[in-house]
Amino acid sequence: MSKLSNISAIKIADDFGADQFHDDAMLTLLEDGKIDGVSIFSELLNEENTRKLKNLKDTHSIQIGLHFNLTSGDGLPNVSELLRNAISRSLDVDYVVDSLVSQLNIFQSKFGYLPDFLDGHQHVHSFPLINQVVSK
């Protein structure tokens, strides 16, 4: 049990950028120190919330990560279809790489630096093939 006492839990809220109601709640939790960071949909994040997150990072040392998205949005497969394609190895790896690079570039253009961490919307970062891409 003593080894566990050296481990600290990091509390991260995901889906930041999906809608203003939840974004406002997460901003309040960050300001109050109730959570340690957020993972964002880089393609959905607006300028005002980008500014607020930058300020909180400066004043509260929060973590801001990329919430890698391959399943939510027009023209994207649902999570079941994506998982089937990943397991059967029929997933287009170039598409995954291009999506990741695009989302990282958007993040960097908004914040001026790369994310503190990366996770996946609907845990897609743990799917076969996708986990190999995000691990590189």
Where would I find each of the regions flagged by the language model?
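Acidic-and-aromatic substrate-binding clefts and catalytic sites of carbohydrate-active enzymes
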Residues: 16-20, 40-50, 72-73, 123-129
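Alpha-helical scaffold elements lining the catalytic groove of polysaccharide deacetylases
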Residues: 90-105
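Structural preference for beta-strand elements that scaffold enzyme active sites
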Residues: 8-10, 35-39, 61-67, 114-117
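Active-site gating loops and adjacent loop-to-helix segments of metal-dependent hydrolytic enzymes
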Residues: 73-94
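Boundary/entry segment of secreted carbohydrate-active catalytic domains
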Residues: 1-21, 26
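Histidine-centered catalytic micro-motifs
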Residues: 11-16, 66-68, 117-127
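Acidic (Asp/Glu)-rich catalytic clusters
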Residues: 2, 26-33, 47-65, 105-111, ...
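Catalytic domains of cell-wall/extracellular-matrix polysaccharide-remodeling enzymes
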Residues: 108-136
